Amino acid sequence: MPIYDRQQRKQLDELVTDFAEHKVGRRQFMQRALAVGLSASAATSLLAACGGGNTITSGNNTSSSGPTKSSTVDLLNVWTGEEKDSFDAVTAPFISQNKITINAETTRDLSATLTTRIRGNNAPDMAILPNPGFMQQLAAQGKLIPLDSFLDMNQIKQDYSQGWLDLGSYNGHLYALFYKAANKGTIWYNPKTFTAGGYQTPSTWSDLIALSDKIAQSGKYPWSMGLSSAAASGWPAADWIAQIYLSQNGGAMYDKWVAHQIPWTDPSIKTAFQTFGQIANGKHYINGAPQSILSTGFQDASYLPFKNPPAAYMYYLGDFTEGFITGQFKSAVPGTDFNFFPFPTINSQYTGAITGGADVVVALKNTTAVQALVKYMATASAQEIWVKRGGFTSPNKSVDLAAYPDAVAKASAQQLTQAAIFRFGADDLMPQAVENAFWKATLEYVQNPGQLDSILNSMESTAAQSYTS
């Protein structure tokens, strides 16, 4: 999923739903589509695809009658460029062996496109979704094929931890295969500068603060941080706070937070913000804070620990940061010039808890070709093709760790597959209005940490409206 388009994607998804439920007319539809950023022609095409507000039909989602014979798979996804090339490499042996054609359609607004196609009775055979929340919605509507109706579940349970199976299930059935994952329990550093400074990677939060203080006391800046990301500014801080919350409170409380079963004014949420503030607040940790944090792009901030001389020593963000580093510093050697250490333990009850994300494979039609492709994509051998090419972390425990192209990628995959507790990033699972408010709240907190109570009260007002609407 392209992180930078999450806001537009969700807005279009809501617009399509509102139109189909006759909450808005054609004129309002066009006005909102243009406001989101669509061109007039694109908005007109989307309106036409909605079919004048046709309601969702029940789709081909049952497996009781057996699969329909087919030799093609229409697959809707978000992969372009190197990701598309790698997926083509994965499917090449499958196509050759099974004589099945895969028609892959790429879209930047997958949720809106898929919703529109379903409403127009033109659903693809399969789709790669951005998060399990959308999968749960489609499963509840009866739009998806239960994968456990044809997968070897004994093998699946051997390959995937129960946490991944739970995330992919609805009402006791498996509807989603988690495929290309992201590990957000990673703090990035330069081993050479750590060695030169006599620094040890910390394993607990108190150790992390002690290390940060030690670096700051030497007249250097221990951290880099950038929260700027155009309309989505603030999401890196939301990732920080989600990881902190899970590490402090565990999965059960995290789930309550995401579902708004506890208010945003709950002390546990305030504590998570304040813990994040131990890093973000105060000019002694981050050069130019707080303004530099707010104005610096998240990718630009990732470079600072790896400059010569270093402009910082640590940077937090998901394992996709490796791509930022190697893209900027072409000669950087994984494990030598850059590495990560696992997010440190805050509460010993939840050691090893990590947040992350993953692309979600779902089936919308029950055909022999779909069943064959899903079975193939679920195998470790198929996933290892992409793993070896780089840029792919698999939650499949049976994928050979030796297949990863370098020690850093291997370590991230190992951390992900062996995580004692795993949860998707909290903001990705929240209603759009709450997600947007969360991002904004993190920016306000960095700017004015003394206003935290007011910020959380405002968050609670937004959540109270969004979860009941």
Task: Give the predicted meaning of each segment.
Residues 132-185, 209, 215, 236, ...:
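Hinge/lid segment of periplasmic solute-binding proteins
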Residues 175-179, 209-262:
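Extracytoplasmic/periplasmic solute-binding protein
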Residues 116-117, 124-125, 156-192, 222, ...:
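A structural signal for short loop-to-beta-strand junctions that line the ligand-binding cleft
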Residues 212-213, 258-293:
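Glycine-centered hinge/linker elements that transmit conformational signals in sensory
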Residues 93-160, 167-169, 192-203, 304-306, ...:
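Extracytoplasmic "Venus flytrap"/periplasmic binding protein-like
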Residues 1-28, 40-45:
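N-terminal secretory signal peptides
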Residues 92, 96-97, 317-321, 327-392:
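Extracytoplasmic/periplasmic substrate-recognition and gating elements
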Residues 195, 414-469:
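Conserved C-terminal helix/tail region of periplasmic/extracytoplasmic solute-binding proteins
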